[in-house]
Amino acid sequence: MIKWPWRTQPPAQQDSYPWPEACAIPLLAALGDDEQQRLIALARQVIRQKRLIPLQELRVTPLMEARIALLFALPVLELGIGWLDGFHEILLYPEPYVLHEEWEDDIGLVHCGPSVQAGQCSAQGPVVLNWLDVRDSFDCSGYNLIIHETAHKLDMRNAGIASGIPPIPLREIAAWEQALHAAMEAIQEEADLLGKEGASMDAYAASEPAECFAVLSEYFFSAPELLSERFPAVYAHFARFYRQDPLQRLYQSGLLTPESF
C-alpha cells in the first residue's frame, strides 16, 4: 500500500512530483498560468489528504499520482478542497475489475452474476478507479473516469445520495431537473435511432439522473463545445455550479475558434 504524504510532511516533499510533466495533457492545455498554479496547489492538498492504494501489484509512479490528483482537483478548482471531504481513500486497480452483484430486471426478476466495473464510489466509502481508464482520461474526448466519480461524490453531498442534483440553491432545482431530464430524453432518442455506438454522446447518461450528471460533467470539462452545442441549458447550469467555463477557457487559449465546430 502506498500512503500519500499527509499535511505534516515538509514542503520539500510536496515538490517532489513532476508537476510540469503532469500538467502536459490535452485536458489541461487551456488552463491559464494562474489556473494551473491553483490547480497544482489543490492537487497537492489531494495528495496530502487522501490515501492512494494500488491493488493487484500495480506499481504507481509519482507522475501517475500527480495526474490522478490533478484530475480530482479540476472539478473543485473554484469550489475548494472541502468539497472532496466525502472520501479518504482512492483504490486503484490496473484495469477494469469484476464484481459479483445482484440486479433486478424490468419484470422484477433478481439476477446475480459478474459485472465488469471501470470505477465506483459510495457516500462515505473510497473512490475506486482503474489505471487503464484513468490513462484514457487525459484527452478531450468526453470521457473521464475521475471526473465521473468525483461528480458522484459532489452529488452525494446533497443528502448523502446520488440524485443528479448536487448542492445548489433551492430556487435553481426545478430548472436544473428540467434541463437534465430533457437531456436524458434526447440522448435516449438518439441512442434508439442510431444505436449506442453511433450516438454522439454516451448513452449511459440516459440511464438515470445521477449518471446523467456524472456523464455530462465529463463532457463539461473534456468536450465543452459538444455539451454546449447539444444542451446549452445543462451547460449553463453546470457552469454556475462548478463556477468554471471550460468552453470560454478554450476560446481564450486559442485552442478553439467559432469555426472549429
Curated annotation (Swiss-Prot):
Lineage of the organism: Bacteria, Pseudomonadati, Pseudomonadota, Gammaproteobacteria, Enterobacterales
Residues annotated for Zn(2+) binding in this entry: H111, H148, H152, E211
Example of a GO cellular component annotation carried by this entry: cytosol
Name of the gene: mtfA
Originating species: Edwardsiella ictaluri (strain 93-146)
Keywords carried by this UniProt record: Aminopeptidase, Cytoplasm, Hydrolase, Metal-binding, Metalloprotease, Protease, Zinc
Major localization listed first in the record, in broad terms: cytoplasm
Subunit structure: Interacts with Mlc.
Any Pfam family hit: Peptidase_M90
Compartment annotation: Cytoplasm
Name of the molecule in the record: Mlc titration factor A
Function of the molecule: Involved in the modulation of the activity of the glucose-phosphotransferase system (glucose-PTS). Interacts with the transcriptional repressor Mlc, preventing its interaction with DNA and leading to the modulation of expression of genes regulated by Mlc, including ptsG, which encodes the PTS system glucose-specific EIICB component. Shows zinc-dependent metallopeptidase activity.
Family under the similarity heading: Belongs to the MtfA family.
An example Gene Ontology biological process: proteolysis
MF-aspect GO terms: aminopeptidase activity; metallopeptidase activity; zinc ion binding
Keyword Transcription regulation belongs to the record: no
Superkingdom to which the source organism belongs: Bacteria
